[in-house]
From Swiss-Prot:
GO molecular function: cytokine activity; frizzled binding; receptor ligand activity
Localization, UniProt: Secreted, Extracellular space, Extracellular matrix; Secreted
Glycan attachment residues as annotated in the record: 295
Protein family: Belongs to the Wnt family.
Gene3D superfamilies: 3.30.2460.20
Gene Ontology BP, a term: positive regulation of fibroblast proliferation
Keyword presence, Disulfide bond: yes
Name of the featured protein: Protein Wnt-2
GO CC, alphabetical: collagen-containing extracellular matrix; cytoplasm; extracellular region; extracellular space; Wnt signalosome
UniProt-listed InterPro entries: Wnt, Wnt2, Wnt_C, Wnt_CS
Main function: Ligand for members of the frizzled family of seven transmembrane receptors. Functions in the canonical Wnt signaling pathway that results in activation of transcription factors of the TCF/LEF family. Functions as a upstream regulator of FGF10 expression. Plays an important role in embryonic lung development. May contribute to embryonic brain development by regulating the proliferation of dopaminergic precursors and neurons.
Source organism per UniProt: Homo sapiens (Human)
Keyword Signal carried by entry: yes
């Protein structure tokens, strides 16, 4: 008996994902290569031709992107710090994160979005700091303008975020645009959501000029907010990520569950449910939670009950040096004493079979 047509389409994205042998963004590995731009461009594996051309033509932009990798990976680890999967990186892995992102999960959606956002942020900042020859401050922010407070003059250095977005789109999306599979479309969608997130927090800053601090004349400029705001925003999008399936002509998505809203360009999308990340699983790329510190009094994701997946925890009595008895001394220093603090540290027990498993 033949399966209903609707059932075939529900399975199609998973089939396409299984047939896709490699979905990692190898440019993430730029952080590990370092060195000169030529060394970096020639030694990052898996770059497509257009990425390698951009790499050679714009060494100053590549330096900014390379430095930015550390920033967005740190932000990813901050957002996932209390979760079983904590955005851990693998130094010798060309994909930076290992096999865990081969699954088209919520975690993959977040990493692609935060990495794309990180590229926009790094390039735009480098432009404003005069570190990139091909861009500078936003050339459109000149002359006078008007807002709710009245007329002001554009001055200072407005962040040229449009250049950052344009270059990030050309470089980051290049590999995905060569693919026609479901995972490539998912990555492109989440890359765009990440870029849009940075621009969302572009804010106008102003300085007043006048006698005795009066604001008879204002000079304003546009500046990116701290990257933490982008990370927090994408974290909320991660928690509200929408599971999708491919539409029938293979050009876009539709929601996997009719009760869910249709994803917007700002939403994160994913195909597959995440593993539980409880145990070390070579195939899934999960390191498990054995040895992870848990919070005995928490009721959240970092609680010992949740983090340790019901396996229990070990308690160690440790001492650490802390600052105590701090006092302010005029003017202008804070002086503290060094004190020993005793505390209990709780870590998740390993499963009875601690060897690598191939279970998914």
């Amino acid at each position: 008996m033949n399966a209903p047509l609707g059932g075939i389409w529900l399975w199609l994205p998973l089939l396409l994902t299984w047939l896709t042998p490699e979905v990692n963004s190898s440019w993430w590995y730029m952080r590990a290569t370092g060195g000169s731009s030529r060394v970096m461009c020639d030694n990052v594996p898996g770059l497509v031709s257009s990425q390698r051309q951009l790499c050679h033509r714009h060494p100053d932009v590549m330096r900014a992107i390379s430095q930015g990798v550390a920033e967005w990976t740190a932000e990813c680890q901050h957002q996932f710090r209390q979760h079983r999967w904590n955005c851990n990186t693998l130094d010798r892995d060309h994909s930076l994160f290992g096999r865990v992102l081969l699954r088209s999960s919520r975690e993959s959606a977040f990493v692609y979005a935060i990495s794309s956002a990180g590229v926009v942020f790094a390039i735009t900042r480098a432009c404003s700091q005069g570190e990139v020859k091909s861009c500078s401050c936003d050339p459109k922010k000149m002359g006078s303008a008007k807002d709710s407070k009245g007329i002001f003059d554009w001055g200072g250095c407005s962040d040229n975020i449009d250049y950052g977005i344009k270059f990030a789109r050309a470089f980051v999306d290049a590999k995905e645009r060569k693919g026609k599979d479901a995972r490539a479309l998912m990555n492109l969608h989440n890359n765009r959501a990440g870029r849009k997130a940075v621009k969302r927090f572009l804010k106008q800053e102003c300085k007043c000029h006048g006698v005795s601090g009066s604001c008879t004349l204002r000079t304003c400029w546009l500046a990116m907010a701290d990257f933490r705001k982008t990370g927090d925003y994408l974290w909320r999008k991660y928690n509200g990520a929408i599971q999708v399936v491919m539409n029938q002509d293979g050009t876009g998505f539709t929601v996997a569950n009719e009760r869910f809203k249709k994803p917007t360009k700002n939403d994160l999308v994913y195909f597959e449910n995440s593993p539980d990340y409880c145990i070390r699983d070579r195939e899934a790329g999960s390191l498990g939670t054995a040895g992870r510190v848990c919070n005995l009094t928490s009721r959240g994701m970092d609680s010992c009950e949740v983090m340790c997946c019901g396996r229990g925890y070990d308690t160690s009595h440790v001492t650490r040096m802390t600052k105590c008895g701090c006092k302010f001394h005029w003017c202008c220093a804070v002086r503290c004493q060094d004190c020993l603090e005793a505390l209990d540290v709780h870590t998740c027990k390993a499963p009875k079979n601690a060897d690598w498993t191939t279970a998914t």
